[in-house]
């Protein structure tokens, strides 16, 4: 989702709720933020679960390059349809399935990217479930091993100041 704005300030629903319950903004101001905070289709702009997992899936090789950071309403996203459709046809013709692409190395790449981006902690559960389904030996200790030697580089919301659209 592209950033929602109230004036020139980006809308943050969670922050607005805190301001409302503490009496810093009125019910009307809160409703204004809510009505503008999600102005279109796509995942929330911060590094929450959806963007974290989209990034991880891209790093695993299960989506096209730049697919995860491309805003849903961008011209580039619209143009991706052609690349995606030809890729799907190629995968079907060559009988390539996700389990043919997923490897321990691709999972490690995903965890490195999650760490670099400061991704959602929900990714641990999702990645472990993917590994179990794919019969890839991977544990929470592997997350720790990888994160110990991988820097956190992104300043993305909710803790930072940038959005997924800025990464694209």
Per-range role (PLM):
Residues 1-7, 11-12:
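Single conserved hydrophobic/aromatic residue that forms the stacking wall/gate
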Residues 13-40, 59:
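Conserved thiamine diphosphate
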Residues 24-27, 46-50:
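Short, amphipathic alpha-helical segments
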């Amino acid at each position: 989702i592209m950033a929602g704005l109230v004036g020139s300030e980006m809308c943050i629903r969670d922050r607005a709720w805190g301001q409302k319950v503490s009496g810093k903004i009125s019910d009307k101001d809160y409703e204004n933020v809510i009505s503008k905070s999600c102005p279109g289709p796509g995942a929330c702009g911060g590094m929450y679960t959806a963007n974290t997992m989209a990034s991880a899936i891209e790093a695993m090789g299960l989506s096209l390059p730049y697919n995860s950071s491309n805003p849903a309403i961008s011209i580039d996203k619209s143009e991706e349809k052609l690349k995606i459709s030809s890729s799907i046809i190629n995968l079907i013709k060559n009988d390539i399935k996700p389990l043919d692409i997923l490897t321990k190395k691709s999972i490690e790449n995903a965890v490195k990217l999650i760490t670099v981006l400061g991704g959602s902690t929900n990714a641990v559960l999702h990645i472990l479930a993917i590994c179990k389904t794919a019969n890839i030996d991977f544990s929470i200790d592997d997350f720790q091993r990888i994160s110990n030697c991988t820097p956190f580089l992104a300043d993305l919301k909710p803790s930072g100041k940038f959005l997924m659209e800025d990464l694209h």
